[in-house]
């Protein structure tokens, strides 16, 4: 069985027009940024299969010839760069037809399932829509939801290849595992600081899971977080104790700090202006400046954002300054987690062998 990437076409490989959601002319054909370099890096490890819904293909509203011309040019372009797809699987039906082959249904992939043609543990669906995520669930594999800003092709390749981005000095891999058990929570955190990859995060708080994934993704490392907390009361203990366990794991994985950059700074992120400054100083401190209009984003209390970073700073013995301005609370919180991840990525990067302190210790 071969590791396989089942890849959506419109909005993932190529840009999807927001006017009519059809690529029916050469003028509309536009590759997504960095898709060719990413696929070139991935092709040694994965087989590629395109799986696409094309509403009304073959009808007067979307003639087959109008589809074929830009599609064939796209395929020829990929092939000219050394990228080939084993198959192109297309559902031509509209949602109201309720067919069996339209994503997230799996009939298009029946032969892959019956003949065990893909490695369940090492195959992924990559697409920009929730239906792509649901397709992965129906296949029993994992999904990576493409987004040109939040999860672009560079990040996807980095995740799938597990490439080292923080250990330029080629020191021994930095790993830590922390188990924290209290009356309120049971938490296990594993961190691979020098290995990017797909993160397994389950805290029971969906928005919080997404935020933790942002830290690891933009930090250039891989982590697993499993938490069972007293969510029947609220999410406070889950968020706080996860921050404490994560901070402890980061501190352990970083180790004696010899050779690290120590400092990090980044701004802005997304349409919000999020600033983060970090010093792995051994002296815990937090300066947090953010105002939220809503009490909750999804299942996450906005007031816990500051508490998370405060708990994290004191657990990992770091100085953290965070500031964000913007209009959308969801985007503001997400930009803070992403900015922290990017800043942490700089600070944990190994650049030599010296202790980054005039005192000789951190």
UniProtKB/Swiss-Prot annotation:
<dbReference type="GO" id="GO:0046872">
    <property type="term" value="F:metal ion binding"/>
</dbReference>
<dbReference type="InterPro" id="IPR005954">
    <property type="entry name" value="HisB_N"/>
</dbReference>
<feature type="binding site">
    <location>
        <position position="8"/>
    </location>
    <ligand>
        <name>Mg(2+)</name>
    </ligand>
</feature>
<dbReference type="Pfam" id="PF00475">
    <property type="entry name" value="IGPD"/>
</dbReference>
<dbReference type="InterPro" id="IPR023214">
    <property type="entry name" value="HAD_sf"/>
</dbReference>
<keyword id="KW-0028">Amino-acid biosynthesis</keyword>
<feature type="binding site">
    <location>
        <position position="128"/>
    </location>
    <ligand>
        <name>Mg(2+)</name>
    </ligand>
</feature>
<dbReference type="InterPro" id="IPR000807">
    <property type="entry name" value="ImidazoleglycerolP_deHydtase"/>
</dbReference>
<feature type="binding site">
    <location>
        <position position="93"/>
    </location>
    <ligand>
        <name>Zn(2+)</name>
    </ligand>
</feature>
<feature type="binding site">
    <location>
        <position position="99"/>
    </location>
    <ligand>
        <name>Zn(2+)</name>
    </ligand>
</feature>
<dbReference type="Pfam" id="PF13242">
    <property type="entry name" value="Hydrolase_like"/>
</dbReference>
<dbReference type="GO" id="GO:0004424">
    <property type="term" value="F:imidazoleglycerol-phosphate dehydratase activity"/>
</dbReference>
<comment type="similarity">
    <text>In the C-terminal section; belongs to the imidazoleglycerol-phosphate dehydratase family.</text>
</comment>
<dbReference type="InterPro" id="IPR006549">
    <property type="entry name" value="HAD-SF_hydro_IIIA"/>
</dbReference>
<feature type="region of interest" description="Histidinol-phosphatase">
    <location>
        <begin position="1"/>
        <end position="173"/>
    </location>
</feature>
<keyword id="KW-0511">Multifunctional enzyme</keyword>
<dbReference type="InterPro" id="IPR020566">
    <property type="entry name" value="His_synth_bifunc_HisB"/>
</dbReference>
<protein>
    <recommendedName>
        <fullName>Histidine biosynthesis bifunctional protein HisB</fullName>
        <ecNumber>3.1.3.15</ecNumber>
        <ecNumber>4.2.1.19</ecNumber>
    </recommendedName>
</protein>
<feature type="active site" description="Nucleophile">
    <location>
        <position position="8"/>
    </location>
</feature>
<dbReference type="InterPro" id="IPR038494">
    <property type="entry name" value="IGPD_sf"/>
</dbReference>
<feature type="binding site">
    <location>
        <position position="91"/>
    </location>
    <ligand>
        <name>Zn(2+)</name>
    </ligand>
</feature>
<dbReference type="InterPro" id="IPR036412">
    <property type="entry name" value="HAD-like_sf"/>
</dbReference>
<comment type="pathway">
    <text>Amino-acid biosynthesis; L-histidine biosynthesis; L-histidine from 5-phospho-alpha-D-ribose 1-diphosphate: step 6/9.</text>
</comment>
<comment type="similarity">
    <text>In the N-terminal section; belongs to the histidinol-phosphatase family.</text>
</comment>
<dbReference type="GO" id="GO:0004401">
    <property type="term" value="F:histidinol-phosphatase activity"/>
</dbReference>
<keyword id="KW-0368">Histidine biosynthesis</keyword>
<feature type="active site" description="Proton donor">
    <location>
        <position position="10"/>
    </location>
</feature>
<dbReference type="InterPro" id="IPR006543">
    <property type="entry name" value="Histidinol-phos"/>
</dbReference>
<feature type="binding site">
    <location>
        <position position="101"/>
    </location>
    <ligand>
        <name>Zn(2+)</name>
    </ligand>
</feature>
<feature type="region of interest" description="Imidazoleglycerol-phosphate dehydratase">
    <location>
        <begin position="174"/>
        <end position="362"/>
    </location>
</feature>
<dbReference type="InterPro" id="IPR020568">
    <property type="entry name" value="Ribosomal_Su5_D2-typ_SF"/>
</dbReference>
<dbReference type="GO" id="GO:0005737">
    <property type="term" value="C:cytoplasm"/>
</dbReference>
<dbReference type="InterPro" id="IPR020565">
    <property type="entry name" value="ImidazoleglycerP_deHydtase_CS"/>
</dbReference>
<keyword id="KW-0963">Cytoplasm</keyword>
<keyword id="KW-0456">Lyase</keyword>
<dbReference type="GO" id="GO:0000105">
    <property type="term" value="P:L-histidine biosynthetic process"/>
</dbReference>
<keyword id="KW-0479">Metal-binding</keyword>
<keyword id="KW-0460">Magnesium</keyword>
<feature type="binding site">
    <location>
        <position position="10"/>
    </location>
    <ligand>
        <name>Mg(2+)</name>
    </ligand>
</feature>
<comment type="pathway">
    <text>Amino-acid biosynthesis; L-histidine biosynthesis; L-histidine from 5-phospho-alpha-D-ribose 1-diphosphate: step 8/9.</text>
</comment>
<keyword id="KW-0862">Zinc</keyword>
<keyword id="KW-0378">Hydrolase</keyword>
């Amino acid at each position: 069985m071969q590791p396989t990437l089942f890849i959506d076409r419109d909005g993932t490989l190529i840009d999807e027009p927001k006017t009519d959601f059809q690529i029916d002319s050469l003028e509309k054909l536009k590759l997504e940024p960095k898709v060719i370099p990413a696929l070139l890096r991935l092709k040694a490890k994965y087989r590629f299969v395109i799986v696409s819904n094309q509403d009304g293909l073959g009808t007067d509203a979307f003639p087959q010839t109008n589809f074929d011309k830009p599609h064939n040019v796209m395929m020829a372009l990929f092939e000219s760069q050394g990228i080939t797809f084993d198959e192109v699987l297309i559902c031509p039906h509209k949602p109201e037809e309720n067919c069996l082959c339209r994503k997230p249904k799996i009939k298009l992939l029946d032969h892959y399932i019956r003949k065990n043609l893909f490695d369940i543990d090492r195959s992924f669906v990559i697409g920009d829509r929730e239906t792509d995520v649901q397709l992965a669930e129906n296949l029993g594999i994992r999904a990576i939801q493409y987004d040109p800003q939040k999860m672009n092709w560079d990040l996807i390749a980095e995740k799938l290849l597990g490439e080292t981005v923080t250990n330029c000095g080629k020191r021994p891999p930095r790993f830590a595992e922390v188990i924290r058990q209290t009356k309120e929570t049971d938490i296990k955190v594993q961190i691979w600081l020098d290995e990017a990859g797909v993160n397994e995060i389950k805290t029971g708080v969906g928005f919080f899971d997404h935020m933790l994934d942002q830290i690891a993704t933009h930090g250039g490392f891989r982590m697993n977080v499993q938490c069972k907390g007293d969510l029947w009361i609220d999410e406070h203990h889950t968020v706080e104790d996860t921050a404490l366990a994560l901070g402890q794991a980061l501190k352990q994985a970083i180790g004696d700090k010899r050779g690290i950059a120590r400092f990090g700074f980044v701004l802005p992120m997304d349409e919000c202006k999020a600033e983060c400054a970090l010093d792995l100083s051994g002296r815990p401190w937090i300066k947090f400046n953010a105002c939220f209009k809503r009490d909750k984003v999804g299942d996450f209390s906005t007031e816990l954002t500051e508490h998370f970073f405060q708990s994290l700073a004191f657990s990992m013995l770091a100085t953290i300054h965070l500031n964000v301005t913007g209009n959308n609370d969801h985007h503001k919180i997400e930009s803070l987690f992403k900015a922290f991840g990017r800043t942490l990525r700089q600070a944990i990067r190994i650049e030599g062998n010296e202790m980054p302190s005039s005192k000789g210790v951190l």
